[in-house]
UniProtKB/Swiss-Prot annotation:
PROSITE patterns: IGP_DEHYDRATASE_1, IGP_DEHYDRATASE_2. One of its GO terms (cellular component) is cytoplasm. It comes from Bifidobacterium animalis subsp. lactis (strain AD011). It is found in: Cytoplasm. This is Imidazoleglycerol-phosphate dehydratase. It catalyses: D-erythro-1-(imidazol-4-yl)glycerol 3-phosphate = 3-(imidazol-4-yl)-2-oxopropyl phosphate + H2O. Belongs to the imidazoleglycerol-phosphate dehydratase family. SUPFAM superfamilies: Ribosomal protein S5 domain 2-like. Keywords: Amino-acid biosynthesis, Cytoplasm, Histidine biosynthesis, Lyase. GO terms for biological process: L-histidine biosynthetic process. Pathway: Amino-acid biosynthesis; L-histidine biosynthesis; L-histidine from 5-phospho-alpha-D-ribose 1-diphosphate: step 6/9.
């Protein structure tokens, strides 16, 4: 069964058309009208090996918040949809990723219980302007939106970092690598749900 999803979401604030394939090779085509976010979502697809096509637009004349948030919401929903009942996946994974002085660790549990903890970001990171009109605060907001709408537990911890671009990119790549292994089929439990209660 193909682990794919295609979701279109239209609101008065944004328009999102997102398609993904969990069993891809990391091919991406990303256009969100927010250049730095394009860069981050491209990295997320590339390093998770999720094929990802996104066409998004919104009221970026106000700010990038709505377009960024709604894209993350739809990505989370598509991830949840493509995973189905989660039979045969590894479920748990973690990844630690460096980018120069920045070092981020992501820990994922594809549990069906949404939770997100982000920690370690330096004071003032949330106010940093990265690549124009993408603020540091949006990184945490993206992580929370993905976690809650994919119904996964995500812990994101920044171990070290100074440059806002490097911090954001290390965190996105850490999430990507953790997702790659958490959603990967485990040949030792083919067809089984990785939970003692029999459902996720």
């Amino acid at each position: 069964m193909a682990r794919t999803a295609h979701i279109v979401r239209q609101t008065s604030e944004s328009s999102i058309d997102l398609e993904l394939n969990l069993d891809g090779t990391g091919k991406t085509n990303i256009e969100t009208t927010v250049p730095f976010y394009n860069h981050m979502m491209t990295a997320l697809g590339k390093h998770s090996l999720i094929d990802l096509n996104i066409v998004a637009s919104g009221d970026t004349d106000i700010d990038a918040h709505h377009t960024v948030e709604d894209t993350a919401i739809v990505f989370g929903e598509a991830l949840r949809q493509a995973l189905g009942d989660k039979r045969g996946i590894r479920r748990f994974a973690d990844a630690t990723v460096p980018l120069d002085e920045a070092l981020a660790k992501a820990v994922v549990d594809v549990s069906g219980r949404p939770y997100c903890v982000c920690s370690g970001e330096p004071e003032g990171f949330q106010y940093a302007m990265i690549g124009g009109h993408f603020t540091g605060s949006l990184v945490r907001h993206v992580m929370e939106s993905i976690a809650f709408h994919a119904q996964i537990c995500l812990h994101m911890h920044l171990i070290a970092g100074r440059d806002p671009h490097h911090i954001a990119e290390a965190e996105f790549k850490a999430l990507a690598r953790a997702l790659r292994f958490a959603i990967e089929p485990d040949p030792r439990i083919q067809g089984l749900i990785p939970s003692t209660k029999g459902a996720l």
